[in-house]
Amino acid sequence: MNPNCARCGKIVYPTEKVNCLDKYWHKACFHCETCKMTLNMKNYKGYEKKPYCNAHYPKQSFTMVADTPENLRLKQQSELQSQVRYKEEFEKNKGKGFSVVADTPELQRIKKTQDQISNIKYHEEFEKSRMGPSGGEGVEPERREAQDSSSYRRPTEQQQPQPHHIPTSAPVYQQPQQQQMTSSYGGYKEPAAPVSIQRSAPGGGGKRYRAVYDYSAADEDEVSFQDGDTIVNVQQIDDGWMYGTVERTGDTGMLPANYVEAI
């Protein structure tokens, strides 16, 4: 249904309709309220939802007010209220910005834990990239050399996981066979226990290290230690990992090389 014109009240058809100031107008009825000049969408100015030309557009006029004591008091009171509101907003938003955090022992522990997690993730990514399909053939000889030197195999390099103290369990199992061999020859009754003990000890040359950071084991083949612990029977596996025994707890396993220093 066609709307009515806001000026003359007659029906406005689409061919002559002007939609402006939230009303509908005929093109001929859309003129200035004062001089009746026909306006368009480019040169009109609206005031109280009525069209005006640029010359007759109502202008705001300001009245001069004398600086009486009452007016000065009101002005000063308004400024004080504005200043009070500004301080209130400032105090409300004060805690939402940057604030200095005290370096407490709890925050230091959290920071150290995050550094350890980042270091572990770095080593995991390094191991994954080193054991990828493209570089698997070149890494295999290095892996075998590490197994022969340390008598230890990481779970990621074998199909079935083995117990934590692998070097001590294997020679004990071979001891009865050695005794049977010596008894079959006859006359030689010296026990083969020293041989098994000699193999069970890690071949690290008696190196001793001291822990400079706390470390929590991230895998079953690793050991946990605290700052200041002594690591004995240490042997180097690669640039990033070592194998040794924590003297305080007696646990044996892998540990990161950058968490300890030589004594």
From Swiss-Prot:
All residue ranges annotated as the SH3 domain in the record: 204-263
> What GO terms fall under cellular component here?
cortical actin cytoskeleton; cytoplasm; focal adhesion
Q: Which PANTHER family match?
A: LASP (PTHR46218), LIM AND SH3 DOMAIN PROTEIN 1 (PTHR46218:SF2)
Q: Where is the LIM zinc-binding domain?
A: 5-56
- N6-succinyllysine occurs at 112
Positions of modified residues (N-acetylmethionine): 1
Q: Which GO terms describe its molecular function?
A: actin filament binding; metal ion binding; monoatomic ion transmembrane transporter activity
- Taxonomically, the superkingdom here is Eukaryota
Locations listed in the record: Cytoplasm, Cell cortex; Cytoplasm, Cytoskeleton
Each Nebulin repeat occupies one of these ranges, namely 61-95, 97-131
Compositional bias per record (Polar residues), positions renumbered to this chain: 148-162
Residues carrying Phosphoserine? 99, 118, 134
Region annotation Disordered: residue ranges?
Answer: 123-207
The N6-acetyllysine modification is found at: 42
Q: Which UniProt keywords apply?
A: Acetylation, Actin-binding, Cytoplasm, Cytoskeleton, Ion transport, LIM domain, Metal-binding, Methylation, Phosphoprotein, Repeat, SH3 domain, Transport, Zinc
Please give the residue positions where the record annotates the modification Phosphothreonine. 68, 104, 156
Q: Look up the record and give one Gene Ontology term from the biological process aspect.
A: monoatomic ion transport
| Assembly information from the UniProt record | Interacts with F-actin. Interacts with KBTBD10. Interacts with ANKRD54.
Functionally, this protein is described as follows:
Plays an important role in the regulation of dynamic actin-based, cytoskeletal activities. Agonist-dependent changes in LASP1 phosphorylation may also serve to regulate actin-associated ion transport activities, not only in the parietal cell but also in certain other F-actin-rich secretory epithelial cell types.
Chief subcellular location equals cytoplasm
Q: Gene name?
A: Lasp1
- Glycoprotein among keywords: no
Full protein name: LIM and SH3 domain protein 1
Native organism? Mus musculus
**Cited SMART domains:** LIM, NEBU, SH3
N6-methyllysine PTM positions read 75
